[in-house]
Amino acid sequence: TSTELAVEAINDLIRQGMNVSEVSCLACGTSYPDQIMPGQGVMVHGLIPNAPPYEVLTAAGVCVAGMAAMKHAYNAVRTGEHQSSIAVASEAASSIMRGEHFQAEIEQRLLDEAKPEIGFEKDFLRWMLSDGAGAVQLSHQPNQHGLSFKIHWIDLISYANEMPVCMYAGAEIRDEQFVSWKNVTKEEREARSLM
């Protein structure tokens, strides 16, 4: 799962000498969590061995979820609110991009248009998106041993005010209107691969 991948990335930090008791902030980013609620961050926190209570943030979004988590972890330390934080990002896209998940949509499109382009669209995404995770510990001071780096700034800027957003999961634009998965039937969700 995406949660397990994130925890394994954090376990790598632990194996490298990170003490989870010295951390007080955890920021997790993912595009497609394993569950709708609760947030990915608390799911990850619950699986970190011997972790104390943390401030936890879950960042979502397609391409920027991991960097949004990194920015939160960075700001948590930069402002002095926390001495040490963890930023982790994980994705497990393979579980949702399997062909059988799109069979109803393919069949519906064949009926509607007799054009099977959906197969190419979904295959493209399946091969472009991969599973993986990475984690980093941020601290108010450099490491005593080993590699350290300093973050000078992180800018996350949206241009959704100028360009249409893309890569929906759980929604689509239909006839120039936003349609949420919550407002359609189960059959329509399957026929349009909204989830």
Located regions from the model:
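Phosphate/pyrophosphate-binding loops at sites that engage ATP/ADP/AMP, CoA/4′-phosphopantetheine
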Residues: A9-S24
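Short, flexible helix-coil linker/hinge segments at the edges of structured domains or between repeats
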Residues: I96-G119
